[in-house]
């Protein structure tokens, strides 16, 4: 079975509605760093690391107690993780996705890697408590923190598949998601496992 290489960008990948070649994506990253908002700065910084010639990358956990602790990972391992996620959740080429997580942590980085590798059409927005505030679009695949999911309950009908992780999902939130008939999955993982290792 063919496995994409980390150096390749899927030809169906769209970023905010536009396709970019590898070199064009580097320019987008530079623009994010130079002129973008804070969340775009982190996205640009990650993209430059991902698109460089190295086959490895340093990552920081979403819930790491030590802000300065980073671990070096093989980029192809991240690709394999993205493919596993796509296979498990049935995320496929051309699906729409929303990036609403901070890109300075692994969860936000993985969402962008999934889009580039799986060929998703991903929209980037500033991380906030309610990512669907003033956003009327629908999405096939979204990853959120429990706080975001809680504040977006009335809007989650716009999401075909939702994964919630990065922090404890309370019983109250679990019940609310069930009552709202949201196709949601609680994920558990850590930096060392490259995103989630358990789902329910």
Where are these regions (language model features)?
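Conserved AMP-binding A3 loop
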Residues: 55-83, 90-92
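A general structural motif
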Residues: 54-56, 93-94, 136-139, 157-159, ...
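Conserved ATP-dependent adenylate/AMP-binding module captured primarily in the ANL superfamily
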Residues: 1-34, 79-101, 128-140
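Conserved S/T- and glycine-rich ATP-binding loop of Class I adenylate-forming
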Residues: 61-62, 97, 112, 142, ...
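Gly/Ser/Thr-rich phosphate-binding loop
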Residues: 153-200
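AMP-binding/adenylate-forming
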Residues: 75-80, 96-151
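Conserved pre-ATP/AMP-binding loop-to-beta segment of ANL
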Residues: 40-59, 93-96
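Generic structural signal for well-ordered alpha-helical scaffold segments
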Residues: 47-48, 83-87, 149, 153
